UniProtKB/Swiss-Prot annotation:
Active-site residues, as the UniProt record annotates them: D52
PANTHER family hit by this protein: PSEUDOURIDYLATE SYNTHASE, TRNA PSEUDOURIDINE SYNTHASE-LIKE 1
Gene Ontology biological process terms from the UniProt entry: tRNA pseudouridine synthesis
Leading EC class: isomerase
Family: Belongs to the tRNA pseudouridine synthase TruA family.
Quaternary structure annotation from Swiss-Prot or TrEMBL: Homodimer.
Alphabetical list of HAMAP family matching this protein: TruA
The organism of origin for this protein: Erythrobacter litoralis (strain HTCC2594)
Catalytic activity: uridine(38/39/40) in tRNA = pseudouridine(38/39/40) in tRNA
Domain of life: Bacteria
Gene name, Swiss-Prot/TrEMBL: truA
Keyword tRNA-binding: no
Protein name from the UniProt record: tRNA pseudouridine synthase A
Lineage: Bacteria, Pseudomonadati, Pseudomonadota, Alphaproteobacteria, Sphingomonadales
């Protein structure tokens, strides 16, 4: 058996998330079916992160094991040929040691959340960014974001369906930047709780529009209470950017 590592890019709009679902299409299902068509064998895809319905990826790392003489280049070509009906692309394929694991070997994950801050309707970025018509103060959002950086109990910022045993996470980076009408929120950590990034962005948006004071973000954090969450940002503005591994 050979272990192949993939880098996946996908538009999450038509999928019910990355992981296989009983009642709807998933990225995992599409890739596994493409692999079956390419290799004439069943495989199981393992990925560095889990994305919800409508969440996108620029560089999701995944792996599967297969018995084949195909080179990574030819395998990538076959997968992409069978993935054409879907908004999924394999942008890299390589052979990894048999003990390497896309999820368990990962030591860092990064996301970006895109907000388009304008009144005019979105066209190209529809379903690929969150449109906020009210003027946002990105500098206030940046100051509030720094109150969340560090090791904290993020109970307020995780969904009620979160299966993580421990709500304590170390947030390494949360940066807010503006480029014209677009505001991007960058988040980096070893791992995240379910809905954590979207929950943090939602509260930063409230700060940006003046509904919340900057200090209220910290107050919500310290409350350790999901009921104190101000707003959960919609999924379509969120992108899994990259997974980091030991060198």
């Amino acid at each position: 058996m050979t272990r192949f590592a993939l880098t996946l890019e996908f538009d999450g709009t038509p999928f019910m998330g990355l992981q296989r679902q009983k009642h709807g299409p998933s990225v995992q299902q599409a890739v596994e079916e493409a692999a079956r068509a390419t290799l004439n064998q069943d495989i199981t895809l393992h990925s560095a992160g889990r994305t919800d319905t409508g969440v996108h990826a620029l560089g999701m790392r995944s792996h599967f094991d297969a018995e084949t003489d195909l080179t990574p280049f030819r395998l990538m070509g076959g997968l992409n040929a069978h993935l054409r009906p879907h908004p999924i692309a394999v942008t890299n394929c390589e052979i990894m040691p048999e003990d390497w694991h896309a999820r368990f070997a990962c030591i860092g994950r990064s996301y970006v959340y895109r907000i388009i801050n304008r009144r005019a309707p979105l066209t190209i970025d529809r379903k690929r960014a969150w449109q906020v018509p009210q003027q946002l103060d990105h500098e206030a959002m940046q100051r509030a974001a720094q109150l969340l950086v560090g090791t904290h109990d993020f109970t307020t910022f995780r969904s009620t369906q979160c299966q993580a045993k421990d709500p304590v996470k170390s947030l390494d980076r949360l940066e807010v930047e503006r480029d014209g009408d677009e505001i991007r929120v960058h988040a980096e950590a070893r791992s995240f709780l379910h809905h954590q990034v979207r929950s943090m962005v939602g509260c930063l948006k409230l700060v940006g529009q003046g509904t919340w004071r900057e200090e209220e973000v910290e107050e919500a954090l310290l409350a350790r209470d999901r009921q104190r969450l101000g707003l959960n940002a919609p999924p379509h503005g969120l992108y899994f950017v990259a997974a980091e591994y030991p060198r």
